[in-house]
Amino acid sequence: MRKYIKIGVAGPVGAGKTALIERLTREIACKYSVAVITNDIYTQEDAEFLTKNSLLPPERIMGVETGGCPHTAIREDASMNLEAVDEMVARFPEVELIFIESGGDNLSATFSPDLADVTIFVIDVAQGEKIPRKGGPGITRSDLLVINKTDLAPFVGADLSVMERDARRMRNGQPFIFTNLMKNENLDGVIGWIEKYALLKNIEDPASLVR
């Protein structure tokens, strides 16, 4: 019986996927056995960033060079990532959480159900308040939508109440959360969601979750 949960993290370039994983691992690595697999087209830049900045030892972080469309590597042909998962589990049989970060992609990114048990999709306020209502599978079908960089709203003319209204409509009852990862704002809500809906802990919904 498999004992670990695979969490897929996707979203456009620069939205905060790597930052989210870095902040999460800092907070939860003391409670759970965690590993990370990153995807980049031609480099291992995200893996190198996490190695330098997260609290995880380097052997718990693995970079996959997809050499092509990042969407394909997490959906149509996830074989490289599945092999990376197998290797990570062989290294750490006690692992409980494996984060799999997609390379930067558009709003249509989705994970193969063989690769991810639950999915988090990250967008950011700097892309404009219209982003939630543009839809796409990442926004409408992910298990959790993270709307990051709330601190930038005044500088880009984004109304967070409009983004909340549109996200409610597009998500149709599925949870989402606003974050400012630079200051760890609502990071505890993301952790609470992971514990309740990925690890199936018997806890209350985090107060910062919106439906």
UniProtKB/Swiss-Prot annotation:
Statement: the UniProt record of this protein carries the keyword Cytoplasm: yes
Protein source organism: Actinobacillus pleuropneumoniae serotype 3 (strain JL03)
Annotated PANTHER family: UREASE ACCESSORY PROTEIN G
Subcellular compartments: Cytoplasm
Protein name stated in the entry: Urease accessory protein UreG
The entry's keywords: Chaperone, Cytoplasm, GTP-binding, Nickel insertion, Nucleotide-binding
InterPro entries found in the cross-reference section: CobW/HypB/UreG_nucleotide-bd, P-loop_NTPase, UreG
Single GO BP term: urea catabolic process
Pfam family, one: cobW
Function as written in the Swiss-Prot or TrEMBL entry: Facilitates the functional incorporation of the urease nickel metallocenter. This process requires GTP hydrolysis, probably effectuated by UreG.
Single GO cellular component term: cytoplasm
Family: Belongs to the SIMIBI class G3E GTPase family. UreG subfamily.
NCBIfam families, A to Z: ureG (TIGR00101)
Record gene name: ureG
Tree of life domain: Bacteria
Subunit structure: Homodimer. UreD, UreF and UreG form a complex that acts as a GTP-hydrolysis-dependent molecular chaperone, activating the urease apoprotein by helping to assemble the nickel containing metallocenter of UreC. The UreE protein probably delivers the nickel.
